[in-house]
């Protein structure tokens, strides 16, 4: 009989996944702290000291999440050296979709010509990209698809209150994409947790703007992220010294520094692009991944 957990060697169950291409896109308009301080009671020094952010990219009128997502997707497909027709599924993580439906993924499909792909969006705020990656990973491991395009795309500038200085200074717009493919070696592990007690710490309603309890989110992240990192390292039998980069969601430089300290890992192993991008929500991890890739800082086999 078949016993769960008993896997035959050489079956599809052994299939793992790897990133075979990356791409990113940000709006050309840059909004720096000095310009923010012309219409908000804030200053460059105040923002930088608390967040590490100097500037952020802001979408022009009519520049949508799908437009940025499609730009990032085209670059990722080119980087992977494949044709758009080879993409079998497109998953877009976004909290700022063009429409409630059609999904942003459908709009991307249309723009890039991935006519054979299954398409859907996924909404999980800043963690969206990781959830989308875990779904793509599961699809490939199950043998359903061979190549999946995973995108994080946000135009947060359209949903923040530009009079709320505690929130609007944090966010930026952008999109990052990866093509996930099959890999017979290596191991991909996802461990996703959600804090059941803090659902209201960061909200975006249908009628109003983003509302955030920054202090609560900060203390949660500094406490919980190191635990999750340790869990993944243990499960993959990897020592923290073997890890080249820890690529975290780019929410706040102070937060990332605190996490590095708690893990007792040099902060240099935590790449950041907050200074020029701000918090791009679901786009932050894939945008950063693509930047590292373009700077030739990633080598196949890196952890």
Label every PLM stretch briefly.
Residues 1-14:
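Short, Lys/Arg-enriched N-terminal segments with co-localized hydrophobic residues
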Residues 14-61, 162-223, 227, 303:
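Condensing-enzyme catalytic core mediating Claisen C-C bond formation in acyl metabolism
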Residues 19-21, 47, 76, 90, ...:
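Buried hydrophobic positions in well-ordered alpha/beta secondary-structure cores of metabolic enzymes
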Residues 25, 93-98, 124-129, 152-157, ...:
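Acidic, glycine-rich active-site loops and adjacent beta-strand->loop/helix elements
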Residues 40-49, 99-113, 149-156, 200, ...:
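Acidic-glycine-rich active-site phosphate/pyrophosphate-binding loop
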Residues 66, 70-73, 77, 97, ...:
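Claisen-condensing/thiolase-fold acyl-transfer catalytic domains that form or cleave C-C bonds
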Residues 72-87, 228-244, 292-297:
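Phosphate/pyrophosphate-binding loops at sites that engage ATP/ADP/AMP, CoA/4′-phosphopantetheine
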Residues 139-172:
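Flexible, glycine-rich active-site loops centered on histidine and acidic residues
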């Amino acid at each position: 009989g078949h016993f769960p957990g008993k896997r035959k060697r050489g079956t599809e169950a052994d299939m793992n996944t790897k990133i075979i291409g990356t791409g990113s896109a940000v709006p050309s308009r840059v909004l720096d702290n000095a310009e923010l301080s012309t219409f908000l009671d804030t200053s460059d020094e105040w923002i930088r000291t608390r967040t590490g952010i100097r500037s952020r990219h802001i979408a022009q009128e009519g520049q949508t999440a799908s437009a940025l997502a499609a730009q990032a997707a085209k670059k990722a497909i080119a980087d992977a050296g494949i044709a758009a027709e080879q993409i079998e599924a497109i998953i877009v993580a976004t909290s700022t979709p063009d429409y409630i439906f059609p999904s942003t993924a459908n709009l991307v499909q249309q723009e890039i010509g991935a006519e054979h792909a299954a398409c859907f969006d996924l909404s999980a705020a800043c963690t969206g990209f990781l959830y989308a990656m875990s779904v793509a990973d599961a699809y490939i491991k199950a043998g359903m698809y061979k190549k999946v395009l995973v995108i994080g795309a946000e135009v947060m500038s359209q949903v923040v209150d530009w009079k709320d200085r505690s929130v609007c200074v944090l966010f930026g717009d952008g999109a990052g994409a990866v093509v996930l493919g099959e890999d017979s070696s290596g191991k991909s592990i996802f461990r996703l947790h959600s804090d059941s007690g803090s659902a209201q710490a960061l909200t975006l309603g249908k009628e109003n703007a983003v509302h955030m309890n920054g202090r609560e989110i900060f203390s949660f992240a500094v406490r919980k992220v190191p635990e999750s990192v340790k869990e993944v390292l243990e499960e993959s039998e990897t020592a923290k010294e073997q890890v080249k980069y820890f690529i975290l969601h780019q929410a706040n430089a102070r937060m990332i520094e605190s996490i590095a300290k708690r893990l007792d890992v040099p902060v240099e192993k935590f790449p950041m692009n907050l200074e020029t991008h701000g918090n791009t929500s679901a786009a932050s991890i894939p945008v950063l991944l693509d930047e590292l890739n373009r700077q030739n800082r990633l080598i196949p086999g890196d952890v």
